[in-house]
Amino acid sequence: MKPGRRPILRLQNSKRVPPAPVRALFRAAGWTEDIAAYSPAQIRKLLRHSHLVLTAWNPKQELVGFASAVSDGVLCGLVQNLVVHPRYRRHGLGTRLLRQLAGTMTRQGIPCLYALGIRGPRARTFFRRVGFHPLRWDVFVRLAR
């Protein structure tokens, strides 16, 4: 994509995404130890169990953006993934995906959306710009061994 040009993209709200483009996008974005390493069956399961999945496709039908959230459907949700292909960054696609994700969850009656693991000043600025704010509490995690 040429610098300075806004891409013409199609956003889609659907869990029916083939696993191969999802893996390719995560690999291109440098997530090699995460979803890029998952099997097609694991990716299908991830999609199926997500509350909401948004994808962005370029005119060549290549997956260039992906956002997903998990939720209880009532009280809160969690941004699970937000990935934009490196060639499509800094053009507003991440903002569009996150705003649509948050807006859809709000329209579904889910009043609270969390985003965890936000690292670095650019990421924090990005999430603040889209309406998120930092919480002043500890977050605990239990990892399977």
Give the location of each predicted region.
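Short alpha-helical
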Residues: 17, 74, 121-122
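A conserved beta-strand-loop-helix scaffold within acyl/acetyltransferase catalytic domains
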Residues: 41-60, 64-83
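Conserved acetyl-CoA-binding loop-helix of GNAT-fold acetyltransferases
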Residues: 84, 90-103
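Conserved GNAT acetyl-CoA-binding A-motif
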Residues: 105-118
